[in-house]
Amino acid sequence: MPVQWTVSHPTRLVIAVARGNLRLLDIEHYLDGVVTANALAYRKIFDMTQATPSLSDDDLMALGARIRAYIVLGRIGPLAIVATAGKSHEQARMFAALAEADRPIKIFRELHLARQWLDSQPDVTG
C-alpha cells in the first residue's frame, strides 16, 4: 500500500508515510481513513520522501477541492508535508495552495523539522 498511516487519538496526531508510486486514489484512500477515524481536526504529518508522485495538475485540483469541501465537517488540523525531491516538493507546494482550509500548512525537506513545527501548533479539536 503506497500510503500507510497511524491515527493517535490520545495525542490527536495522524502520521502518514507514502512509498513508491503515489496516485490520486492512494491519497483519497488516506483521506477517507482520516475522515472515518474522525481525525480531520488532528495535527497531521504526511511524509512523501520515499514516494514518487504520479499526480497530474487535475489530480491536485481535485484534492484541493476535496479538502476545501471538508470545511463543512468542522475544523481541519495543521498539516506538515515532508518532501525532498524536486517534483514532490513542487507538487506539495501546489497542493498547499489549492487546499486552503483555514489551517496552518507547511512544507519541509526534513522530517524532524516538520515534527518540531507540528508539535508547536495548537490543538484545534476543542
Q: What would you call each of these model-derived segments?
A:
Residues M1-G126:
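Amphipathic, Lys/Arg-enriched alpha-helical "gate/interface" segment within cytosolic domains
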